[in-house]
Regions:
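Transition-metal
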Residues: 1-118, 178-206, 230
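Short acidic-glycine-tyrosine-enriched beta hairpin
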Residues: 136-148, 263-283
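Ligand-binding loop in jelly-roll beta-barrel domains
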Residues: 62, 70-75, 84, 105-107, ...
Length: 302
């Protein structure tokens, strides 16, 4: 996290919450005349000008996305998230659909879904017999790989994987398996076996990785879902961006290089690898000016 992304974090830090409206972990403005204000305060003051009118009507002052970097030193727990309907019924919360963009991978892997057709009873049998690992789908990953994880898909991040995560604003997680780890007192971590049963999507897919074609100086759509739209932009020269046809804020996450964001009357905001910038919905035209070969993720809502 510190060496690759330049984060001022300890060696043991596993996550960097880049843009968050989650209570207790709300993002703060880092520069400009609004420096020191929270994202919550900005949504309350600027409403549709910041979020987009249609987004504000849907979510109010609650920021709808949470963006992170995650650096896994060991395999994280196998987990699943409920969809909106189940999360609302149980937790009065949104569900959690998310996506991962692999920044670096030291020969790492992740888990996405199952490796065969399954039903609820077969899943439970493997779980009860301690054979869950046999039915999980393991994927070797490389920088630039994208995985879309809809609510209901079991998943886990493996050791040596550094990734960017884009998700609905929700902290509801059902832990299924934690590799038989124990705490200092020898106690296993709490699992949510029963809660997870109604949340899991048992369907099998031949290909869990998102296919997209990387093109220079073009905006390539990779994920288009009801919860967020994410595109990949590879830059080696300036690119003009026009957002007049969308009614949403835009977020850039810099995966590689460094980029100037030019807007207004000559203003320029710079960002480098590991940094994240929120563009308000009222800003419809800007230019992306790379100072070296760069890669951005572009995120917004429809």
């Amino acid at each position: 996290m510190r060496d690759v992304l330049g984060k001022s974090a300890s060696d043991k830090a596993g996550e960097s919450w880049e843009i968050s409206g989650v209570e207790g972990d709300i993002s703060m403005v880092q520069n400009g005349f609004l420096e020191g204000n929270s994202l919550q305060e900005l949504t309350e003051i600027y409403m549709g000008d910041l979020l987009g009118d249609s987004i504000y009507q849907r979510f109010g002052v609650e920021f709808p996305l949470l963006l992170k970097f995650i650096d896994a030193a060991d395999f994280l727990s196998v987990q699943v998230h409920p969809d909106d309907k189940l999360a609302r019924e149980r937790h009065n919360s949104y569900g959690k659909t998310e996506m991962w963009y692999i920044v670096e991978s030291d020969q790492g892997q992740l888990i996405a879904g199952f490796n065969r057709e399954l039903d609820r009873e077969q899943y439970l049998q493997h779980l009860q017999e301690g054979k869950l690992k046999e039915i999980l789908n393991y994927e070797k990953v490389a920088p630039g790989d994208i995985y879309f994880m809809p609510a209901g898909r079991v998943h886990a991040i493996g050791a040596g994987v550094l990734l960017a995560e884009i998700q609905q604003t929700s902290d509801v997680t059902y832990r299924i398996y934690d590799w038989d780890r124990t705490d200092n007192q020898g106690n296993p971590r709490e699992l949510h076996t029963e809660l997870a049963l109604d949340a899991i999507d048992f369907s099998f897919h031949k290909n869990y990785k998102t296919d997209y074609q990387a093109l220079e100086n073009s905006t390539v759509n990779a994920v288009d879902s009801p919860f967020f739209t994410t595109s990949v932009i590879h830059l080696d020269k300036p690119v003009e961006k026009d957002y007049n046809l969308i009614d949403s804020f835009v977020i850039y996450m810099c995966m590689e290089g460094a980029v100037g964001i030019a807007y207004g009357k000559g203003e320029v905001e710079t960002m480098k690898k590991g940094e994240t910038v929120l563009i308000p919905a009222e800003l419809k035209n800007l230019a992306l000016i790379p100072t070296e070969a760069s890669t951005l993720l572009e995120v917004y809502l429809k």
